[in-house]
Structure formats: structure tokens, C-alpha cells
Amino acid sequence: MTVKTEAARGPLTYSRMRGMVAILIAFMKQRRMGLNDFIQKIANNSYACKHTEVQSILKISQPQEPELMNANPSPPPSPSQQINLGPSSNPHAKPSDFHFLKVIGKGSFGKVLLARHKAEEAFYAVKVLQKKAILKKKEEKHIMSERNVLLKNVKHPFLVGLHFSFQTADKLYFVLDYINGGELFYHLQRERCFLEPRARFYAAEIASALGYLHSLNIVYRDLKPENILLDSQGHIVLTDFGLCKENIEHNGTTSTFCGTPEYLAPEVLHKQPYDRTVDWWCLGAVLYEMLYGLPPFYSRNTAEMYDNILNKPLQLKPNITNSARHLLEGLLQKDRTKRLGAKDDFMEIRNHVFFSLINWDDLINKKITPPFNPNVSGPSDLRHFDPEFTEEPVPSSIGRSPDSILITASVKEAAEAFLGFSYAPPMDSFL
């Protein structure tokens, strides 16, 4: 496929050259934007496109006369039909670069697979999503939000990191850190509940991750044991950022009804504007579940559970310390304006007496020995994954990336619902 534009007319003037040079300088300063976005800018710049070398790079063709005998001429080609950049803008990330070994998770839109990079021999968790399923449920904004949030999380030890994202004609791929210590949900199911020191350790690491997200004006909105992983040493790793809301400042609110029923805050159920304190409510619900084995207002009947969340007083059994009781009462405060964290956000949680034994600097640097070690022998140790997933065959279509459908580097993204999805980290040797 090629870009169709007007043939170069007249000599390349100084002003035209300046236009092309300006684009190149901008690219060098903003390499994180990705090659496909850069190519799109060049393709849209009339001065640059008239330069012979640029035409050669883009494979720009000269305009052709329409077929005289065609009574029903085709409409002008869309951007998806105009530029061919080859198989990938990022040679380090396309489906055929990976051996897909096992299914390790499933969701509404696709699967998570253990994969080994053929060249690097590194192991990754690759989240593969079906575009049709996403578009059918009109969830493309959430997928792009997840991608955007992942790009901001790479420097925090308790948030899963994104290495690459790319797409084919029918699928989206997130190449993520491979975490194989199991979901917190999995361990809670096996042990029913945790002793208070273990619950405190996990709650502290979770709070640290949430506080970091809040510092970026991101509200997580979907904290639950299924989204909390343990790494091979036993530290928590927060994953699945599809429901995150960006650009929520300290006093900012949003109103989208979303989350998981057991962990919804009262203001969300009331369909009132809510703020980042919804995350502290969820932290309280998860801590309660770690200590007692079930979420605080749980009922098999969803309507009854919602009524409990809205109206039932919090009931705490006597087998926890006073500091744990006080923390749960503060986090599970139904009035968000009185909830722990409403004034000073993470600092209120950090300074609570329940966490007085936590050295937060040591925590963030992973100098505190986790209370539980998953004892995994290596990347191929899948003991902490549900056999329901790992025994499922890997779909053969997952690893296919024929050049005819791979669009990672194509400016076809400009005409698609997933504009800018593809990502590769900057490389010093790129230019």
C-alpha cells in the first residue's frame, strides 16, 4: 500500500526544506511518540512529501488517471489503504517474535498467555484482546486508557510494567511483566484468610501503589483480589488498568458507574460524583476480606449486597487489633468526605497507627521480607495459576503475524479505534 499525493511541482525551496527539517527535529526530541505517529506527521506535510528521499521512504506513488471505463469509480483510498511501512515499526514486538507457551488467564475480551521472546529468551505475560469484542461493547476508550496508564507505571515496584504494545488487524497485544506468584484471590481461596501481619504487609504495598497512581491524577477504581498478583518473592503487583480514570486531581470527581459489585463504594452505587477516595474504600474492602475471608457487605444476592453497602453498619468481629479495627472503620466510612484519605490522600493511610511497624522507604525498595514466599522454581512453574487456564490449548492464531495483516507501524491506526496503541520504549541507538 502506498501514499498517494500530488507530484512534486517546482524546486525544493528553502521554506519547504525548513518544513521537513522541523518535523525531523521534532521527532528526535519526541521519540516516545512512536514511529507510526512520526510517519503520519510526515505524510500529512506537503513540503516533506515532495522531497525525493521522503517519497522513497514512504513509497509515495504518483497520481494515476482514473480508469475511463469504470462507471462506478471507487472512493478515495482511506489512510488505512495508503501507507505501507512493512511488518512493524518496532522490530522487537510482533506476534511471530514470541513462543506462546501457556494460557494463564482469561477475561471478557481475550486471554493472557505466558510467552518467551525468541531472540531475548525473556518471559512475558502477553495480554491478547479481540478487537471485535471490544468494539461490540464499546470499550475501546477503556483499552486505550489502560495502555496510557501502563506507560506511566513503569517506575513503580508494585505496578505491572508494559514492555510493548502492538496490534494486528484483529487483535491487540500488551506485552507485560510476567508475574507467577499467583493472584491474591487464589491464595485467599486456599487459605480463607490471612493473619494480621501478612494482611498489613499486602495492604501497605497496595496503598503505596494506589498513592503513586493518585500522584499521577489516576483513580484505579477496580481494586480487588483478582487484580492483585504476587511476584516470585511474594511482593504484590497491581495489574489490569482498564477501569482507571485519568486526570482526576485532588478535589476532582467523576461519575461513571463502574467497578466490581462486592467492592463498590456507596457513592458509586448512589450514582453520585465520586473522587479518589473510592480507592481507599476498596482498600478497606480488600483488607477486610484478607482478615475475615469475605468482603465486608457480601451477599450472594446482589441487590441485598448493594443495600448492605448503602445502609448496613459495618460489623467487625473481635479477633483483630484495635488499630486494624480503627483503620477499617476509617476506610469503610460511607460518607466519602469523612473517609480516611479524604483530606491528605495516601499520607493519611501511611501515617495510620496500623502501619506504624512499616518502614515505608524499605517497603518501596523491597527491603522488607514478604511474609509469604510463593516458592516458584522458575518462569515455567505454573503451580499458582488455575489449571482451568493452563490446561487450555494455546490458540494457533495468537502467534501469527503475516505482513498482510500486521499493522503495528501502519498509519492505519489513524483511521482505527485504537489510534496510537502501539508502543515501544525509546532506544538510544535508534537514530
UniProtKB/Swiss-Prot annotation:
<keyword id="KW-0723">Serine/threonine-protein kinase</keyword>
<comment type="function">
    <text>Serine/threonine-protein kinase which is involved in the regulation of a wide variety of ion channels, membrane transporters, cellular enzymes, transcription factors, neuronal excitability, cell growth, proliferation, survival, migration and apoptosis. Plays an important role in cellular stress response.</text>
</comment>
<feature type="region of interest" description="Disordered">
    <location>
        <begin position="66"/>
        <end position="92"/>
    </location>
</feature>
<keyword id="KW-0808">Transferase</keyword>
<keyword id="KW-0547">Nucleotide-binding</keyword>
<dbReference type="Pfam" id="PF00433">
    <property type="entry name" value="Pkinase_C"/>
</dbReference>
<keyword id="KW-1015">Disulfide bond</keyword>
<keyword id="KW-1003">Cell membrane</keyword>
<dbReference type="GO" id="GO:0005524">
    <property type="term" value="F:ATP binding"/>
</dbReference>
<keyword id="KW-0346">Stress response</keyword>
<keyword id="KW-0418">Kinase</keyword>
<feature type="modified residue" description="Phosphothreonine; by PDPK1">
    <location>
        <position position="256"/>
    </location>
</feature>
<feature type="modified residue" description="Phosphoserine">
    <location>
        <position position="422"/>
    </location>
</feature>
<keyword id="KW-0832">Ubl conjugation</keyword>
<dbReference type="InterPro" id="IPR011009">
    <property type="entry name" value="Kinase-like_dom_sf"/>
</dbReference>
<feature type="modified residue" description="Phosphoserine; by MAPK7">
    <location>
        <position position="78"/>
    </location>
</feature>
<dbReference type="GO" id="GO:0006915">
    <property type="term" value="P:apoptotic process"/>
</dbReference>
<feature type="binding site">
    <location>
        <position position="127"/>
    </location>
    <ligand>
        <name>ATP</name>
    </ligand>
</feature>
<comment type="similarity">
    <text>Belongs to the protein kinase superfamily. AGC Ser/Thr protein kinase family.</text>
</comment>
<feature type="active site" description="Proton acceptor">
    <location>
        <position position="222"/>
    </location>
</feature>
<comment type="subunit">
    <text>Homodimer; disulfide-linked. Forms a trimeric complex with FBXW7 and NOTCH1. Interacts with MAPK3/ERK1, MAPK1/ERK2, MAP2K1/MEK1, MAP2K2/MEK2, NEDD4, NEDD4L, MAPT/TAU, MAPK7, CREB1, SLC9A3R2/NHERF2 and KCNJ1/ROMK1. Associates with the mammalian target of rapamycin complex 2 (mTORC2) via an interaction with MAPKAP1/SIN1.</text>
</comment>
<keyword id="KW-0496">Mitochondrion</keyword>
<keyword id="KW-0472">Membrane</keyword>
<keyword id="KW-0053">Apoptosis</keyword>
<dbReference type="GO" id="GO:0106310">
    <property type="term" value="F:protein serine kinase activity"/>
</dbReference>
<dbReference type="InterPro" id="IPR017441">
    <property type="entry name" value="Protein_kinase_ATP_BS"/>
</dbReference>
<keyword id="KW-0597">Phosphoprotein</keyword>
<feature type="domain" description="Protein kinase">
    <location>
        <begin position="98"/>
        <end position="355"/>
    </location>
</feature>
<dbReference type="InterPro" id="IPR000961">
    <property type="entry name" value="AGC-kinase_C"/>
</dbReference>
<dbReference type="InterPro" id="IPR000719">
    <property type="entry name" value="Prot_kinase_dom"/>
</dbReference>
<keyword id="KW-0539">Nucleus</keyword>
<dbReference type="GO" id="GO:0005634">
    <property type="term" value="C:nucleus"/>
</dbReference>
<dbReference type="GO" id="GO:0005789">
    <property type="term" value="C:endoplasmic reticulum membrane"/>
</dbReference>
<feature type="binding site">
    <location>
        <begin position="104"/>
        <end position="112"/>
    </location>
    <ligand>
        <name>ATP</name>
    </ligand>
</feature>
<feature type="modified residue" description="Phosphoserine">
    <location>
        <position position="401"/>
    </location>
</feature>
<dbReference type="GO" id="GO:0004674">
    <property type="term" value="F:protein serine/threonine kinase activity"/>
</dbReference>
<keyword id="KW-0256">Endoplasmic reticulum</keyword>
<feature type="short sequence motif" description="Nuclear localization signal">
    <location>
        <begin position="131"/>
        <end position="141"/>
    </location>
</feature>
<feature type="modified residue" description="Phosphoserine">
    <location>
        <position position="397"/>
    </location>
</feature>
<feature type="domain" description="AGC-kinase C-terminal">
    <location>
        <begin position="356"/>
        <end position="431"/>
    </location>
</feature>
<dbReference type="InterPro" id="IPR017892">
    <property type="entry name" value="Pkinase_C"/>
</dbReference>
<protein>
    <recommendedName>
        <fullName>Serine/threonine-protein kinase Sgk1</fullName>
        <ecNumber>2.7.11.1</ecNumber>
    </recommendedName>
</protein>
